[in-house]
């Protein structure tokens, strides 16, 4: 009966510890205990927490004869099991020294046994980690079993060290069973609380990550196409559906670009910004949060608006300049979730990166267009000079041929300067090249032969404008024009799987890699193809000196619309 009463008293003490553990689980202090880590701050926190439990287990223990029935083993074993041998040993030493300071027949034996209990927990920790069984560390059965063995070891140490021996035997017979039961159950329940908190934390973390990934996938590349009303509305609708919040708005520096959710009847896209929260975020570049309680929120557009809180996050572009804001709202009857707040700030960074990438891409495209215009400026005067001289020479002997050459020259410049779009058909590109070649053939006469072999089924394939002409011009200007014999240029096309292959071959074999302006045309074509389609595409060169130069252009096959 005495043992049963002692069990009840120790269980009461254990319940106090479990309540404290449960309260701790609601604080950030509990988070480091939920994972196996080698970080020093986490291990130090583990040492502090379980040392306190260890000391409390002794302090609130029950005095029996010249000893103390206690739940100290819970702190020592859990410290070792979760923190490892070093933490377990230090927790045991701290708890043991505290017990030794209280004196009594078992002071020394209890100090030693507490250190052993901490080391035993640490030993099990090391074995499980080494075997890759981290899940077993957080198993309540493991915690209970290790504590049960630790208590058995403690009783053996008391019998071995405490004197008089008869008193030690009597003490062990009275406290062994109650302490084994309560400490075992207490350690298992403590681990259960920890495991439940860990499962909940992982659930929220996985849900958070899944939402973040889904939002990232759904909004990928939208704002790269331009920071405007259409694209902003697409992003706002995705966020509204995925975040389960009251409303979402996106603004630039002056007006509302998009709004969806509660209050969309008066928050209309195109309206100038009137919210002080938005203006403050744009002016300071900082996140503005009005929770509706500590920081009151009031809609500036409608006195009866049902929105009760808002989070305004700046969107940044080049040089960290604020380009606009993203605003998340909650209704008056709902709290603004801290998860949505954190997620919102992360999404704002993602969208800012898209805006910045879009700005860079547009700048890159403008630079490429400038290079193309530069190439036109280089080619046109030189070619025009030669063409006019050729026409002048032809007009004296064959006015009809001269008329055709004028027509070819007109076609060349029309195609060269007034391309309707960035992409043209292969047939259009060949027409452009042919106009150039007809003038060059009139200039070189029998010294230049041209063969164009383009299958009819490839004629509607799309490719970037001004792709072939610079390559063909290089073949003549730096190749066949240098020959004393007849120069030959062959242009062909074929399909290879999902690729369109274009070849320009001359019989000069005079190709030399160049990095100066003389090679600007071909280098620019190669650069455009790689930037547009990737490094798997572009120009490759094969040259057999004094025999041939073959330029191969690799483009993606584009199915006809």
From Swiss-Prot:
The chain crosses the membrane at residues 4-24, 44-64, 73-93, 109-129, 141-161, 171-191. Its EC number is 2.7.13.3. It comes from the Bacteria. Autophosphorylated. Residues 25-43, 94-108, 162-170 are periplasmic. It is a multi-pass membrane protein. Keywords: ATP-binding, Cell inner membrane, Cell membrane, Kinase, Membrane, Nucleotide-binding, Phosphoprotein, Transferase, Transmembrane, Transmembrane helix, Two-component regulatory system. Gene3D superfamilies: 3.30.450.40, Histidine kinase-like ATPase, C-terminal domain (3.30.565.10). GO terms for cellular component: plasma membrane. It is found in: Cell inner membrane. One of its GO terms (biological process) is signal transduction. Residues 1-3, 65-72, 130-140, 192-561 are cytoplasmic. It catalyses: ATP + protein L-histidine = ADP + protein N-phospho-L-histidine. Residues 354-559 form the Histidine kinase domain. GO terms for molecular function: ATP binding; monocarboxylic acid binding; phosphorelay sensor kinase activity. Member of the two-component regulatory system BtsS/BtsR, which is part of a nutrient-sensing regulatory network composed of BtsS/BtsR, the low-affinity pyruvate signaling system YpdA/YpdB and their respective target proteins, BtsT and YhjX. Responds to depletion of nutrients, specifically serine, and the concomitant presence of extracellular pyruvate. BtsS is a high-affinity receptor for extracellular pyruvate that activates BtsR by phosphorylation. Activation of the BtsS/BtsR signaling cascade also suppresses YpdA/YpdB-mediated yhjX induction. Interacts with BtsT and YhjX. This is Sensor histidine kinase BtsS. The lineage of its organism: Bacteria, Pseudomonadati, Pseudomonadota, Gammaproteobacteria, Enterobacterales.
